[in-house]
């Protein structure tokens, strides 16, 4: 093998190519620098010394089979041959780039060789010529690029049998997250001494990223209204295995991150129990620290596109549960074994404070849905006026009709009926405060478009109004005081089957 002195500079930089940038982030964290332009030949030599031992551990051998196919771990090779092939890859940056083509990733550099899937994930093998320019298989890469790509071993841990490769709009976030992953990943590699020593696996890639971001945020001073980094992040959860190469792509948008951070900071009393209620502990096959899954974390990757479904699945149920608890409490009170049933009821999960949850819902509408502030305030105000009227008149029938109204016409009927009843009462009592329950302008702002047709998100607005009314009634102890009332007992929980 011919080698030359290392180049005085490596000419490495961020590329906006996810595989390379993740690899560079791994090298930067390993070498304790914050920019790939600061990487030196001495840093790569330090990595080379680590890799020559670590790559032959069972843990990293399995990782290599997933990311770089069998490569130099091919067990048909002798031990000496495998070590020689590895040295050749790790020292690529020390040899001259002699091809006439430019490097695909660093076009300012000449290429050293055309590479296939054994040196760059998700390409084809060395033989096939299809889908390559001029029928020449492989992509031209410089020696620096070939060696740098091995930095993926420092940045892309194996999660559920696939490499978890992160791309971030803000490279400082990429570095910080890789920093959170690298230490436990390297510890796992160092403890891997025997093929028969099967360690519990890492799992739930999306939860792993959210957990790492929370760790990053917990270490940085920040204001409540902003994040210390820009943009979002994407996970490429991939396998380059010859048995079935595949990649799942999960995108985490900035609005979802802002919502998560603000909710946890501004309403911790509601966010913490909500978050914990969606936690699923790791089973015995998974690592206890890196194998658990959280539904809320996973659902963040569906935002903002699936915002209505998110609200209906995670934010609405605690509000409807408040009514259900009151109904169950009323039924238990009439049973002979009341104490036994009450004890069982108290053994359930801690209820989520609805006032805090409504605050979280408002943040969700602001950050994720992008709803205008005037409309949010109108929904909140209408819900409060309805709640005040129901409590004042103890009007359980009105609550029942409002709660079960699904379409625009039934909802308008309920609102008109409430307006009429309040107007009659105000006239009869001579009350000075004769504010209407709602007005035409308020109704149009909440439920209709400019042409006075129902909004496309009418169902969302309807659910938000019900959530606000329930929150007010719950805080006013309306459900608790009327738990035995037949009208409340007969209020059926509506089904949202078929609604999006």
Locate predicted features:
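Conserved small-residue
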Residues: 1-80, 453, 459-460, 464-469, ...
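Low-complexity, charged, repeat-rich alpha-helical/coil interaction segments
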Residues: 20, 24, 35-48, 55-56, ...
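Alpha-helix initiation/capping motif
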Residues: 40, 170-171, 407
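Basic, glycine-/proline-tolerant helical and adjacent loop/strand elements
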Residues: 60-203
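Intrinsically disordered, low-complexity regulatory regions
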Residues: 198-487
């Amino acid at each position: 093998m011919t080698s030359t002195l290392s180049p005085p500079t490596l000419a490495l930089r961020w590329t906006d190519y996810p595989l390379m940038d993740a690899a560079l982030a791994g090298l930067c964290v390993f070498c304790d620098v914050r920019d790939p332009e600061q990487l030196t030949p001495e840093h790569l030599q330090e990595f080379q010394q680590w890799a020559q031992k670590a790559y032959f551990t069972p843990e990293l051998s399995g990782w290599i089979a997933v990311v770089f196919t069998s490569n130099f771990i091919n067990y048909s090779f002798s031990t000496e041959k495998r070590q020689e092939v590895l040295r050749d890859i790790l020292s690529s940056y020390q040899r001259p780039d002699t091809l006439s083509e430019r490097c695909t990733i660093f076009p300012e550099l000449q290429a050293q060789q055309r590479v296939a899937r054994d040196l760059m994930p998700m390409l084809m093998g060395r033989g096939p010529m299809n889908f390559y320019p001029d029928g020449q298989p492989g992509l031209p890469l410089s020696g620096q690029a070939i060696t740098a790509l091995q930095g993926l071993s420092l940045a892309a841990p194996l999660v559920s049998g696939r490499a978890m490769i992160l791309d971030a709009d803000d490279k400082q976030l990429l570095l910080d997250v890789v920093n959170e992953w690298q230490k436990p990943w390297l510890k796992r590699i160092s403890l891997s001494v025997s093929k028969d020593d099967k360690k519990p696996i890492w799992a739930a890639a999306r939860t792993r990223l959210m957990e790492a971001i929370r760790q990053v945020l917990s270490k940085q001073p920040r204001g409540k209204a902003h994040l210390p980094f820009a943009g979002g992040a994407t996970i490429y959860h991939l396998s380059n295995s010859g048995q079935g190469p595949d990649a799942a792509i999960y995108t985490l948008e900035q609005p979802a991150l802002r919502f998560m951070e603000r909710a946890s900071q501004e309403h911790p009393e509601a966010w913490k129990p909500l978050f914990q209620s969606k936690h699923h502990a790791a089973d015995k096959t998974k690592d206890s620290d890196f194998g658990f899954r959280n539904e809320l974390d996973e659902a963040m990757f569906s935002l903002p596109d699936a915002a209505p479904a998110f609200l209906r699945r995670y934010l609405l149920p605690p509000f409807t549960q408040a009514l259900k608890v009151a109904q169950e409490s009323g039924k238990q009170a009439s049973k002979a074994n009341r104490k036994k049933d009450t004890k069982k009821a108290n053994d359930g999960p801690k209820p989520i404070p609805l006032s805090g949850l409504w605050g979280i819902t408002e943040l969700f509408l602001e950050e994720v849905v992008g709803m205008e502030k005037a409309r949010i305030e109108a929904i909140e105000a209408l819900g409060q006026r309805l709640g005040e009227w129901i409590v004042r008149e103890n009007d359980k029938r009105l609550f029942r009709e409002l709660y079960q109204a699904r379409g625009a016409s039934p909802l308008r009927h309920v609102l008109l009926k409430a307006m009429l009843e309040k107007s009659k009462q105000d006239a009869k009592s001579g009350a000075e405060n004769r504010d209407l329950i709602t007005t035409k302008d308020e109704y149009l702002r909440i439920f209709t478009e400019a042409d006075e047709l129902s909004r496309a998100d009418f169902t969302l607005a309807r659910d938000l109004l019900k959530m606000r009314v329930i929150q007010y009634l719950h805080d006013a102890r309306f459900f608790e005081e009327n738990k035995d009332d037949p009208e409340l007992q007969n209020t059926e929980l509506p089904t949202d089957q078929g609604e999006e």
